[in-house]
Amino acid sequence: MSKLTIVRGFNDVLPLDSYKWQFLESKVKLILDRYNYSETRLPIVERSELFHRSVGESSDIVSKETYDFQDRNGDSLTLRPEGTAGCVRMVIENNLATRGQTQKLWYCGPMFRYERPQKGRYRQFYQLGVEAYGFDGIAIDLEVIAIAWSLFKELGISEYVTLELNSLGSSLNRQEYTQALLQYLKPYHAELDEDSIKRLDKNPLRILDSKIEKTQKILANAPKLIDFIDHDLRLRFKQTCQYLDALGVRYKLNENLVRGLDYYTGLVFEWTTDKLGSQSAICAGGRYDGLVENLGGQKTAAIGFAIGMERLLLLLEDLGKLPNQDNACDVFFILDSAQLHQSLAIVENIRQELPQLKIDMDLKFGSFKSQFKKADKSGAKVAIIIGQDELDNGFAGIKFLQQNEEQQQVAFNELINFLER
């Protein structure tokens, strides 16, 4: 029988690594609580139509990367490749953005894309999503950027990330620009890279995102999207930059930043780093003011961003910003297997009274000698011995494992006071 192994592109989080996730997740919650965002939990399976209508049928994600299947009823379902579409569906279905309501939400969970696995890019990956609905003004644009900035500062990596900004204008602006771009690229058709040629028919704006040097040289003299954007939207983008200057948030303008999802409008942004090679983007987002209406809801202003958790962890590890793991327990109990009904009751009472303590024991209840060896390896500060003699006399034995102190005896009814010191 062949050995069963993990699916390519998927990863186990081993016990030795889970503390890194717990550390990052605790920082995420700290920051989002500070800005009064509410957590929501979304299903990992949605109807395929949701992503066709939101992410876009011509996008690389929907056309090449989604995990699609039919259930036993013949319904076409998809493992979510991103979180925004599902969050919008949830908001519409539960009437959370009707009659002028506003919502500030966040979620964190696994997403799925069939991509070539490499460092920082996996077929199952965890994503933090932050979404806000019903806010029209610049203030919410600044707030969502400030949330990411605050998280990076809290993690000690703000000097290693760069905010890149662009404006995509309105849908009409993009249509007009797309026609101008196609007209410009016509004479260069044969010189474009293979992916860019495919995008000419499906999603021409994505050509701006090409990393191929030859294509970038062709684009150097192409029409600029900013020249096709309405005056009001251009002014709004300029004001956003001015406010970021006032907040002390460093940024640079990137006129080729277009994002790979069809639903973005107006402001788009990415946080990038030069520490992770080709997988440089760790956070990306923007406004998507038309998406709620496109999916059947009322016209609703919306903005959000997503952070790739694995990439952020890789960056933290590379920069030495993760805390050292501390698996050591505080107290190790050494028990007589013949008297477990009494001694286990004492241990459980202490766990209830002192929940902050990490308490362990040898559940095989070997000899006292073997239990002491395990106590030494556990990293515990003290070992508490409860054998037959201790039970008969009403005192627990206390052995200090990290200090050169003599063994003590403490009455059972004083153990909690002793451990609190």
Swiss-Prot record:
Keyword list (alphabetical) reads:
Aminoacyl-tRNA synthetase, ATP-binding, Cytoplasm, Ligase, Nucleotide-binding, Protein biosynthesis
Q: What class of enzyme is it?
A: ligase
Q: Which PROSITE patterns match?
A: AA_TRNA_LIGASE_II
Compartments, as annotated in UniProt: Cytoplasm
Record Pfam families? HGTP_anticodon (PF03129), tRNA-synt_His (PF13393)
Write one Gene Ontology MF term. histidine-tRNA ligase activity
GO CC term (a single one): cytoplasm
Task: Give GO BP annotations, semicolon-separated.
Answer: histidyl-tRNA aminoacylation
Is Aminoacyl-tRNA synthetase there in the keyword field?
Answer: yes
Protein's UniProt keywords contain Ligase: yes
What is the E.C. number? 6.1.1.21
Q: Which reaction does it catalyse?
A: tRNA(His) + L-histidine + ATP = L-histidyl-tRNA(His) + AMP + diphosphate + H(+)
Q: Which family does it belong to?
A: Belongs to the class-II aminoacyl-tRNA synthetase family.
Self-association and partners: Homodimer.
This chain belongs to the protein called: Histidine--tRNA ligase
Which organism's genome codes for this protein? Francisella tularensis subsp. holarctica (strain FTNF002-00 / FTA)
Point out the gene that encodes the protein.
hisS
